Amino acid sequence: DYVIFDLEWNQNPDGRRHPDSRLPFEIIEIGAVKLNEKREIVDTFQCLIKPKVYHWIHDSIHEVIHVDYHELEKGIPFPRAIRRFLEWCGEEYRFFTWGDQDVMELQRNMKYYNLLKLMPGPVHYYDVQKLFSIKFEDGISRRSLEYATDYLQLPKSRDFHRALADASYTARILLEIDEACMIR
């Protein structure tokens, strides 16, 4: 299976030093789309996460993702969320993300909670942002998810910067990229 995932995260609302340097960015939402071996969408996953480190949302984060503190308070703790997500992924899967930051922050959050054993590393993944550049541009540039969506003239039915929406856009872009491009 292909698991295309996206994360949203928060940071210190004061914008100054991090209260806990081990977790500069705290994951607050996981969204994912699952494709089968025929590259057909077979399932989705979405989970809000109740913050433990940064209880208030940084202003710039709030402007972008449009989630408020009260919504996050209804979320579940990260350890439960990551277990649900990995269970949803199943036994055999390949991760796909837009860029490399989500994988890095996922591992950092799992390390913070002492949960790296749930996903033995190194974590292998495909960077759809890079694949987009290889297939449609110069192989070097890194474009925004919205740019790629517009470039491919894909319909924009949801707001960007929500985890499930961004995972869905990334999955639709991936479907425009042939498997041969992934082998390169």
Where are the language model's segments positioned?
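Entry/capping segment at the start of metal-dependent catalytic domains
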Residues: 1-38
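Short intrinsically disordered, low-complexity coil segments enriched in acidic
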Residues: 1-2, 70, 139
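Short secondary-structure capping micro-motifs at structural edges
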Residues: 19, 83-84
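Metal-dependent phosphoesterase core characteristic of DEDDh/y 3'-5' exonuclease domains
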Residues: 24-30, 34-65, 86-184
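Metal-dependent phosphoesterase signature
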Residues: 62-81
